Amino acid sequence: MSKEQFIIAMRFLASSVSVISAKDQSGKLYSMTASSVTSLTIDPPSVLVCVNNSASIHDVLTQGKNLCINILQKNQQEISNLCSSKQRESQRFDNDFWDTSHVPFVKKAQSNIFCKVEETIAYHTHKIVIASVESSQSADTFNTLMYADGGYLD
């Protein structure tokens, strides 16, 4: 299968939009829009996130590190766009979208899932991050930002 055929096929996989966020030991904040986030196990609660080796957050996500998976609401496209743009990387936290007092998280997200990295697996161009879920908080109603076929869904 060609790379192009695979990309076209995957464009039909609709998913919620998530932003992964973390803070390094010096307090520097990191975030990225993630297209590959999934639950792994229910007992114990765990998740799997795939991170490109070239992503700035890549080196921060090591064993024992805390991170947050922020599942965005429909009105949070701007956060997704900020966190997916290398050109706007320095602007990602220059707004009031975030609580950065501990592990950074998006305020008013659909859900915030607070995790601890348990294991990472190198696979070609990506790192597979396996994390245990320590806590979560969610909105009362479903209003999740969805993405498919190269754009946000209504």
Predicted regions and their residues:
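Basic, polyanion-binding surface patches
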Residues: 1-154
